[in-house]
Amino acid sequence: MASLISRPYPDSMNNNSGLAFIRLGDEEMKLLFGVSVKSIDPWSWPGGQSRLGKDLRKALHYPKYRYNTFSPFYYGIYDAKDICPFHELLSMIYQHPKYLTYTNLFVNSNYPSTKLLHQSLIRDHRKKIILIINNETSSQKLTELNAWTCEILLYPNNGPLLWQNDKFREQAIGKIVDAAKRYRNRLFLFSIGPLSRVLIHHAWLENPYNRYIDFGSTLDKMTKNRITRPYQSNAELNHDPSYLIKFDTNKRVFHVSSVD
């Protein structure tokens, strides 16, 4: 996955190919199945069907994803036993199993390698990155981020609640669709919670020739200058022994391996 995200400059900027990666975590799964949500971020959901949950389900059911090998659409998933049977989740996803990976691919014990990936992307794709983050980022931090991005799109941190509003939903989709339309062979980095999953869907539909990556909270220390999740200060806190990312400093590549 890391090698797909961080392809060499001549390849990534000249080929008519793209990539999308969305992650289905606890919050997304609960919205999908109408379960109440109490987020670490400043929003919650009392339970029952939400418009965002409905749109998440619609995106999962989109059959066109599986027929676009030139712009593969990857899902990060996990076995959410307390929310739904795993086979039920898999039956909702209209995608070939080879495009399914781990929702926690970038966090926990892999977070140190993810930070190296961030550094690599900023260095290799400077001023060719579109950053999609929450609007709580300070003006001083936005100035710093502007040094290596070509555009920053801001969304409210209570977006999942605002998604119930037709006008907000239309404007939110329109903003990302407009950006996807204006760029080609660029890197879009998303960190706006559950909205990322639906907005990546709309961006990919408009223009599959970009890379749309849901990095989630792994970007928080960089964009907010503070720790928002326990794993950011203790990467071993929730060690998942089923997979591991390692960064080869000599070859400057990432390797994903499975361990028992």
Predicted features and spans:
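C-terminal functional extensions of proteins
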Residues: L195-D260
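Short, catalytically relevant binding-site loops at active-site mouths
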Residues: T137-S139, N157-P160, L195-S196
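A mid-sequence, solvent-exposed acidic-amphipathic segment
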Residues: W148-R186
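Electropositive, gly/pro-rich neighborhoods at or near active sites that engage anionic ligands
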Residues: M1-A147
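Residue-level detector of flexible, active-site-proximal loop/helix-junction positions
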Residues: D82, N157-G159, L219
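Glycine-rich beta-strand-to-loop/alpha-helix junction loops that act as flexible
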Residues: F190-G193
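Hydrophobic residues at beta-strand termini and immediately following loops
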Residues: I22, L153-P156, F215
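Structural motif
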Residues: I129, R186-L187
